[in-house]
Amino acid sequence: MMSLGLVGRKVGMTRIFTAEGDSIPVTVLDVSDNRVTQIKTVETDGYTAVQVAFGSRRASRVTKPLAGHLAKAGVEAGEILKEFRIDAAKAAELSNGAVVGADLFEVGQKVDVQGVSIGKGYAGTIKRYNFSSGRATHGNSRSHNVPGSIGMAQDPGRVFPGKRMTGHMGDVTVTVQNLEIARIDAERKLLLVKGAIPGAKGGKVFVTPAVKTKGAK
């Protein structure tokens, strides 16, 4: 599914109340300053997409090729460039320098949010994969928190790829699907999304219309 989305910054979590008095946990996303830097078409690039910039960056921190690319679009340099695949009809409605705001979505709409999870450092299998620990006593002397067997003997004589073992936990790209937009603050350019979103405060996230919801926009 090809849909235009937004780049945002995770502000943090809070709660809001409905008209019925129900408390809803929400994650606040700052989606300000999404500006179009390039419109890609089938004729020039082989596919249709829109490239947007988010945030700000000092001119001294921008490479000359990128500075020329942004100057051509008449857009200020940003922290990040993100490309969204869209259809030709939607691309025709946009132009370089156009601002894509929070009004791209509507309250109640389902969205997918992608971010980088918080890094936890080196972790064992109990913390990393929720393995069970061994017995504390009754003959168990040195195998309380070990993962157990990681393979067989001479045949096949190796550890299979993908075996869950100790290692770095977190700091991976995670996509949470079908989150609901609880509220939109168009004036402050904020999206309030129901539930938790991967990543630390200040982390960059990508918000797109849900792809697995019936009738998703």
Swiss-Prot record:
> PROSITE patterns in the record, alphabetically?
RIBOSOMAL_L3
- According to the UniProt record, where is the region Disordered? 134-154
| Keyword Signal among record annotations | no
Q: GO cellular component terms?
A: cytosolic large ribosomal subunit
Residues annotated with N5-methylglutamine modification: 154
Record's compositionally biased regions (Polar residues): 134-146
Which example biological process does GO assign this protein? translation
Annotated InterPro entries: Ribosomal_uL3, Ribosomal_uL3_bac/org-type, Ribosomal_uL3_CS, Transl_B-barrel_sf
List the molecular function annotations (GO) for this entry: rRNA binding; structural constituent of ribosome
Asked whether the keyword Electron transport is assigned, the reply is no
Quote the Pfam families the UniProt record gives.
Ribosomal_L3
Which UniProt keyword terms apply here?
A: Methylation, Ribonucleoprotein, Ribosomal protein, RNA-binding, rRNA-binding
Q: How is it modified after translation?
A: Methylated by PrmB.
**Family designation:** Belongs to the universal ribosomal protein uL3 family.
State the oligomer form and interacting partners.
Answer: Part of the 50S ribosomal subunit. Forms a cluster with proteins L14 and L19.
Q: What task does this protein carry out?
A: One of the primary rRNA binding proteins, it binds directly near the 3'-end of the 23S rRNA, where it nucleates assembly of the 50S subunit.
Name the chain's protein. Answer: Large ribosomal subunit protein uL3
Species of origin: Burkholderia cenocepacia (strain HI2424)
